[in-house]
Structures are given as structure tokens and as C-alpha cells.
């Protein structure tokens, strides 16, 4: 399915989006009923867990899912969303399609029914979500070895960094100090996948960073 945009512009806020995701995941046919159990937004993507039951109360039989104890099955769905000229739009797909977007939280995955085929696209998608959730959230002073060298915008590379932070608009923001040069860089969460904690030394914001910004505006930041 392609993108569908709401040209009436009735979807404007987070609450509007969640209400629409709920509506899209809640419907009933002559034989089955679908109900949204949980929806989470990560970035611009919504992740949903939808439960299917039979209207007559019998057990739901499905070729892909193991039926739960209450006779239902619950599957995962992904909704890509974006705004185009003020109009909200979405593109949806079930987990069985193996969506590229794979940042569903573990609390949502826990609601999904067991899969029958361990080699299915859905199984691989769930594993990618778990791998994403397993990426460490490092703290101030943690010294880290990245799984592979990361190429920076100036063409140099780094692999051993220490977590620190800078302030912008009164808020703390994560950055990393490169071991070899002392340079401060920002790294995406995906670049931390498979990284290893070498040591931990808690501390305040980097004194190097404080000196670096001493003569600059408060809202300056690492590149």
C-alpha cells in the first residue's frame, strides 16, 4: 500500500495522530474483531499491537501466529507518517512484511503472539527491534569502544570515545570525546550498536568543552 494523505487536515497534533492510529487498528467484520492494545510513536513512526478475536468466541487459527490462551492472536504493525503541506499522511504495513523501521519498544513486543516460523520476516523484524533496544544508553564518563571505527564529517575516524555532554538552550545534550584527539562529536544511537564499555568515571560536563565554548554563544554545539 502507498501513502494516504488526509487533505482535510484534521490530523494536526500528537493526540490526533494517536486517535487516528487507534481508529485504523479498531474494526470489525462479520467474523472477526480487531482492537488496538498499544501504540507507540518513535520519531515519525508509529508502532502498534493489534489483537484479533473471533466474533463467535471461537479460537483464532492463523498460519503465522500461535493462538494465545484466550483464543486470540496479536500482531505488530508499523505506520510511517509525515506531513506534506500541512496534510498528515501514513503508510502502513504488518510485521509480516519485515518493515525496515524497527524501533518498536520491548513493552509492545511483549504483547505480540508467538510466531510459528522462526525464519519469517516478522521474526527477523522483532529481533531487529530487540537489537535496537539493547544498544546501551551510556552515562557521563563512560569510556566506550565502538564495534567498528566511525568516519566523521572531516574524514577522520574514531573508535574509542568517552561520553560527556554540552548544554544548549539550558538542556544537557549527549556528545562524545574522541580519545585520540580530544575532539567532541555527536554519534547516532545506531553507531553504538555492539559497542563495549571499557571503563566508567562519573563527572561533570567536560572541562575541555567548557573552555571551548567560553568565548562562544551559549547555543553553540559540536558539529
Task: Annotate the PLM regions.
Residues 22-72, 150-163:
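Amphipathic, interaction-prone secondary-structure segments
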Residues 48-100, 173-178:
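Intrinsically disordered, low-complexity regulatory segments enriched in Ser/Thr/Pro
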Residues 128-133:
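Short alpha-helix capping/helix-loop boundary micro-motifs
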Amino acid at each position: 500500500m502507498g501513502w494516504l494523505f488526509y487533505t482535510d487536515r484534521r490530523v494536526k497534533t500528537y493526540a490526533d495522530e494517536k486517535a487516528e492510529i487507534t481508529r485504523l487498528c479498531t474494526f470489525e467484520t462479520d467474523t472477526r474483531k480487531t482492537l488496538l492494545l498499544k501504540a507507540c510513536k518513535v520519531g515519525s513512526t508509529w508502532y502498534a499491537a493489534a489483537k484479533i478475536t473471533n466474533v463467535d468466541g471461537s479460537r483464532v487459527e492463523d498460519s503465522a501466529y500461535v493462538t494465545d490462551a484466550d483464543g486470540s492472536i496479536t500482531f505488530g504493525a508499523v505506520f510511517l507518517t509525515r506531513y506534506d503541506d500541512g496534510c498528515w499522511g501514513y503508510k502502513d504495513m504488518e510485521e509480516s512484511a519485515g518493515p525496515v523501521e524497527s524501533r518498536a519498544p520491548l513493552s509492545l513486543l511483549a504483547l505480540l503472539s508467538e510466531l510459528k516460523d522462526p525464519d519469517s520476516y516478522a521474526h527477523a523484524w522483532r529481533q531487529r527491534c530487540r537489537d535496537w533496544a539493547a544498544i546501551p544508553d551510556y552515562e557521563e564518563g563512560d569510556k566506550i569502544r565502538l564495534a567498528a571505527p566511525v568516519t566523521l564529517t572531516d574524514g577522520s575516524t574514531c573508535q574509542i570515545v568517552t561520553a560527556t555532554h554540552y548544554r544548549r538552550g539550558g538542556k544537557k545534550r549527549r556528545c562524545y570525546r574522541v580519545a585520540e584527539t580530544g575532539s567532541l562529536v555527536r554519534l547516532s544511537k545506531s553507531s553504538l550498536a555492539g559497542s563495549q564499555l571499557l571503563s566508567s568515571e562519573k563527572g561533570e560536563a567536560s572541562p575541555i568543552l567548557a573552555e571551548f565554548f567560553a568565548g562562544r554563544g551559549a547555543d553553540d554545539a559540536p558539529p
